[in-house]
Amino acid sequence: MNYPVYLLELDENGNTKYGLQDIALVESPAYQSSFVKFDEQKLNFAIQNEEKQIVMGAVMIPDKMIYREENGKPFYVVANKETIYEASQKFNSENRNLNVKATHETDTNLSDVFIFESFITDENRVQKVKGFEELPYGTWFVTMKVNNPTVWEQVKAGEFTGFSLEALFKLKPITTLSDDEINTLMSIIDYIKCPLNYLLNTLK
């Protein structure tokens, strides 16, 4: 079976409808990169009998192909470093750090849950993140404070294991690939961290 592959893009003309709306706590994140719970790391300058209730994880990973299906038609989407950078800037400039949901099935933000840190790894500033060393440069991370006791219990119980973004992107068709080609590309990207656009050009 052949699958179309689309590149995620923001609108070049600054159309405000495009971009990230919120970040949800979910059981199965699209990027398959669960967040790290910092409750096990006790600092000396802290009340050691209480949890910090902080989670951190990846929101977007460059060149990671994600399976999607709409109206019964399967396809893949992928974001490059440039789009991820633009999306993170837009999300933060619009002060969306309180836009945190429990799954995407609700329109209500969680109370007492907020994002207080957001960064993108690169060769110069933040090279690697402990627990996520395998993720490539250009990965967007957020750190979230969970003061809501009900939500925190759900995090500890494993009901929420990662982040999932809710966003509207333009889809730019870049190629069509078979099952075998997709599996090969994913294996190469994961193994040598090679940008997807470079690999696609070598196939032409």
Predicted regions and their residues:
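Signature of dsDNA virion morphogenesis modules
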Residues: 1-194, 198-202
